[in-house]
């Protein structure tokens, strides 16, 4: 039971397939949750959403959280996360006037070359070296090419959560450096790179002001209060991207700690005191509300293949059979889609296996093992960059529903891994909202409740070392994994 005097916070996760809302107390008690689906359109490199559905979905999800028992009158603050790199444009009255170009929309290939030529020094300073065509700044240049009257008509850029925040407060709002990172924001200085923008002919007036995540940017206005049930005057707090939100919701906020999300794909995010600079452009860093840095990367390996390859299988039985086969000498690199982004960049990478599986259970075992090996290589990579990896490792994502996979990941890493009781970005936004009143680490420690910690099974020699080293060799042979990375990973396997 939550104490009557306990503060309450509301987090909104604005995703691709839906909006999720969590109402949580300062002690971590979940008081209510709600969701509402979203639709989008994919065609080739194109991926769009109609932004007008976002506010309707947010209102519906908040209403469902209230119906589930949350007393919205007690909410002290609201924060919204969004998919990284998703942008739209608003007119002078705040209405969305273009489709939203989603986080993985890839139409801005030519504009990406233009952006990287103009901002080469700035992107190197930021640590990620080059922008990718799915990032927001190339997409903004693409929008301006297709809507040449935008600047004259007073249009301005809005990240996905900016559109919701402006609805909540009733006027234009600053954006957070996390969502603005892929639009070119200098997170260290909390400024826009105006020389780069000038070179790209992007008016500075088209971009919102910048603040760090966790900054109070306004209060719920009367109109939004009437539509949502929130109290007028409730604080609206600058949010972050969905990946950073998931990290906050995992409780991995202290320097050296890491959140490894094995969902459809693998995302690894950590906390460092200083900015991590990556000469290979694989890892990029967001700013934490605490002022620390949140380096990370997203692989194209993950649990997405489970649904694709084993949709008709009895997964419980398959898991039992796979457990008896581990470790297996069948090595798989289980890419969900072509191309790899982390722990190396290889656009031509394709999923592969070292041989044909003898049984379906062996193929399943090799999938679990392969993803765990890639996760280990990701940790080896960030260690090579100088990031501390000695803190807690928290596992989240759909793969954590498989107990065999959880234990396998601990065994491969030879590190304890923890699993939170509630794992969702919306909870991370409730944590972020609460951090506007108290230090982030203390807020996360109070609000994120761990379910259990798994210890790795110890032996004189890690039974997975031989397979891991063989996988490194296969990746080097294909020309995907740089030799310096493979050498460092091999050195870290030495006793």
What are these model-predicted stretches?
Residues 2-4, 10-11, 116-130, 135-154, ...:
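Active-site core segments that coordinate phosphate-bearing ligands/cofactors
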Residues 1-99, 153, 225-226, 230-235, ...:
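N-terminal glycine/serine-rich phosphate-binding loop of ATP-dependent small-molecule kinases
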Residues 105:
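Carbohydrate-associated surface elements
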Residues 67-102, 128-134, 161, 165-186, ...:
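Short beta-strand-loop/turn "lid" adjacent to the catalytic site in phosphate-handling enzymes
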Residues 32-36, 208, 452:
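Structural signal for short hydrophobic segments within the conserved structured cores
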Residues 88, 110-114, 246-248:
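Pocket-flanking alpha-helical
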Residues 18, 74-77, 209, 354, ...:
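Residues at the N-termini of beta-strands
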Residues 200-212:
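A conserved helix-loop-beta module that forms one wall/lid of the active-site cleft
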